Amino acid sequence: KTDMLMYYDARVNSSMNGLFKRGTLDRLKGYYSVKAWGELLSLRDECALSCDVPDIYSAAATDGETQMLLVTYYTDDAAPLPRTFKVETGEDRLYTIYTLDEEHDMEPFETIASNNGEFTLTMRPNTVVVIK
């Protein structure tokens, strides 16, 4: 169980700051991961998860009305391939996928409908998605 995320150095004029660009305060990629984690924590009630897909890590929470799933595909492989896996939701409805990668800054990427309480997700290496 992970109950805390610590970011070592978020001083705005520090070269170690991975949240904001030095001198301009423009958001860097690290900002969006920390923001998503904060949103997840604000929902309060964590959900049990299991995943047997290598290099895929996830966390989920709900407040009784809103559900959120955060999934990351992190790898150090020299030539990693995309990973495709099933996401079991338990209900049929539309889900919005927010993506953080080289081209996207945790913005809505696609809307997907679950079928029989599940859908298939493909992630590129070193990507984070939020599913709401």
Which positions does each model-derived feature cover?
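Hydrophobic, well-ordered secondary-structure elements that form the walls
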Residues: 34, 69, 97, 126, ...
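Flexible loop/turn segments at secondary-structure boundaries
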Residues: 12-16, 77-79, 104-106
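Hydrophobic beta-strand segments of well-ordered beta-sheets in folded domains
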Residues: 3-5, 67-69, 95
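C-terminal beta-strand-rich structural cap/linker in extracellular carbohydrate-active enzymes
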Residues: 110-132
